[in-house]
Amino acid sequence: MNKTKGFTKYKKMRYMPGLDGLRAIAVLGIIIYHLNKQWLTGGFLGVDTFFVISGYLITSLLLKEYDDTGIIKLKSFWIRRLKRLLPAVIVLLMVVGTATLLLKSDNIIRVKHDIIAAIFYVSNWWYIAKDVNYFEQFSFMPLKHLWSLAIEEQFYIFFPVILVTLLLTIKKRYKIGFIFWGVSIISLGLMMFIYSINGDHSRVYFGTDTRLQTLLLGVILAFLWPPFKLKNDPPKVVKYVIDSIGSLSFIVLILLFFIINDETNWIYDGGFYLISILTLFIIASVVHPSTWIAKIFSNPVLVFIGKRSYSLYLWHFAVISFVHSYYVDGQIPVYVYFIDISLTIIFAELSYRFIETPFRKEGIKALNWRSSYIPQFIRMVIVVTLLIPFMLILVGAFNKYGKDIIGEKANSFDTTIEDNYSMRIAPIDNIHIDGLVSEKKKESSDVYNNIKPLLIGDSVMVDIGESFKSSVPKSRIDGKVGRQLYQTLPLVKANYSQYKKSSDQVVLELGTNGDFTVKQLDDLLNQFGKAKIYLVNTRVPRIYEANVNRLLADAAKRKSNVTLIDWYKRSQGHSEYFAPDGVHLEYKGVLALKDEILKALKKK
């Protein structure tokens, strides 16, 4: 290269509206998924689309700067990234923190911790440490979506340094591309290995090391298909091939958005990698200056949405988290979704116009009191109403209003020695006083000493454990949060093998946390021999609900000693039975489910 390092002028890379169009598709998929998982079960794949785009675009920018000037100014790159990303995030954190304090003060400690993690762009590792499940929506976590921004920011910090080092030490770029491809394979292998050991979704889904594969595929494409070297008018056959491959890949990707769900395990065994390769083909076609698919993705509507994709991504999940927290999940009225969408659009547009654009163009100068972007009065209101409480939240001034919500909830309910139960203290939140009469006392009026059932279940069983034990003192109850049916077989073999006689009664409440197979269900049922088995079906706003209930109903039809307890039917239309997550039970729900189980047990 005949150039003087550091002095040749850097020519800005051409704008590629097709990428904005692809961003629009990705963010719309994510928003629809978070509004209601069952509308677009694989919408979360939009995050991977963003990862591939980021890897491709950032690498292309850095390579072009290196080709034009002979150097890459790392400091300038990092400043541009901060100007682009940080201001909007800080405003989001201030708004969410203040809103949590005003509307959801019980959650202020948890949200404060999430805010601190987000400020330092380590949200993904924070959620791994706290064993948070991305696909589980039982908890109020309005900042959980920032895990992906944390991964991208970590990538922006370390990748340019590695790229510069490789460019200076390795002259053949195809060798550099092979190095990144090798690292992507290592990342893929790490995801497969960790997942195979313990099936831990959280670790492999949130981990920078396991998600690096997707970003690096974008990096590799930048080496193979740099946008600044593409010909404006290639042969027609070349354009036809590019359009055909890109179109077919896009169709397959959209189909996967509808087919894949959060219970699809093969995505952790190479699925994310293959899906990202599809995205590579789409990117290659939409960034080409002469393809018709690029023109389709460059239409004004998609470009408009794509330019605001960052703001839409930032705000949609926070809005949905707050709004949906006032409704029972799975029983949300249609008009609520219009509220979600309207508020998301409003906040995103305000952020784009008054935060993103000014700071991207002017940097810190956007805070100048004489700036035309934000009038002085509005600026003062923002500082007073958001910044001050935000700082107080960070220093823990409002911790007294928060609660250790996770610590307050029982993780298990296990009664194995009947005599010990008389010493157990009923939880205060199970006692409701209306006037001077305790509902707990009313509930305990009927006691059944003539039955000795075994009850095994998940968190719903934990919910009813105290109440059921008070009514059936000789019952044996084993409930654990997060328990799945396939995990129960070893438990039964180890602890409950004696429940095999025709006089025994066994209640199984499983299926809240995931699907299972016919074989897994039959293996469990066969452990109880001739015992009378009662299967409680589930009400859970998840994609697997229908299949779980179908398998349980089929088992009751196939086996003469199995009876179905239809909790799904009993709870239909009774939102008062449920906590906001639509699964766990409020007091009335506890009584209703206990009643259903007792009715079935008393019949035999």
Swiss-Prot record:
This protein's record includes keyword Iron-sulfur: no
Record-level GO cellular component terms: plasma membrane
Membrane-spanning intervals of the chain: 15-35, 43-63, 85-105, 150-170, 176-196, 212-232, 240-260, 267-287, 310-330, 332-352, 377-397
Name of the top EC class for this enzyme: transferase
UniProt keyword terms in alphabetical order: Acyltransferase, Cell membrane, Membrane, Transferase, Transmembrane, Transmembrane helix
Record's subcellular location: Cell membrane
EC number in record: 2.3.1.-
Main location: membrane
Molecular function in Gene Ontology: acyltransferase activity, transferring groups other than amino-acyl groups
Active site, per annotation: S459, D581, H584
Single GO biological process annotation from the record: lipopolysaccharide biosynthetic process
Membrane topology: Multi-pass membrane protein
InterPro entries for the chain: Acyl_transf_3_dom, Acyltransferase_3, SGNH_hydro_sf
CDD domains: SGNH_hydrolase_yrhL_like
UniProt xrefs under Pfam families: Acyl_transf_3 (PF01757)
Family to which the UniProt record says this protein belongs: Belongs to the acyltransferase 3 family.
Protein name listed in UniProt: Putative O-acetyltransferase SAR0937
Organism annotation: Staphylococcus aureus (strain MRSA252)
Lineage: Bacteria, Bacillati, Bacillota, Bacilli, Bacillales
